[in-house]
Amino acid sequence: MISPQQDIYNAVYDVCGNLGDVYEKAPPKGTDYPFIWLGQTELLLDRNKSAIFANVIQTIRFYAKDTQRGTISQLMFDVENALRELKETDQSYIDMVRSNTTVLGEVDGNDNLYHGILEVEFKVY
């Protein structure tokens, strides 16, 4: 059995990988945009003597060129909708209870980018 945190991470990684290029860490210089970078994962355990119940918050980061505003918005929307449809992982039943999206302008060297942040919270049963 793996932790609920890793279980959600694996499920989110699979969903993102089906919709775009996904990385677990900063991709190499020269990587094509847009891409997805899985960020932090937060585990909030509920006290229980006989089972593991938890909420897991997964942060997903999206990067695109400054000419790809529509692309990043659509990619974030597609990932969010696909995650909302998830009802179970390899070891747990899950339910998305909350999501939050933000799109920011960002400068990386001489490149102007869009940086999207999608935070999703799952209840793990």
Where do the protein language model's features map onto the residues?
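Short, conserved charged micro-motifs
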Residues: 67-74
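Short, charged interaction patches at domain edges and termini
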Residues: 1-14, 43-55, 92-125
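Small/polar-rich, solvent-exposed N-terminal microdomains that initiate assembly or binding
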Residues: 1-50, 74-81, 86-93
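Short beta-strand-to-loop capping motifs
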Residues: 62-66, 122-124
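A short small-residue
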Residues: 55-63
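Short amphipathic alpha-helical patches
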Residues: 35-39, 62, 102-107
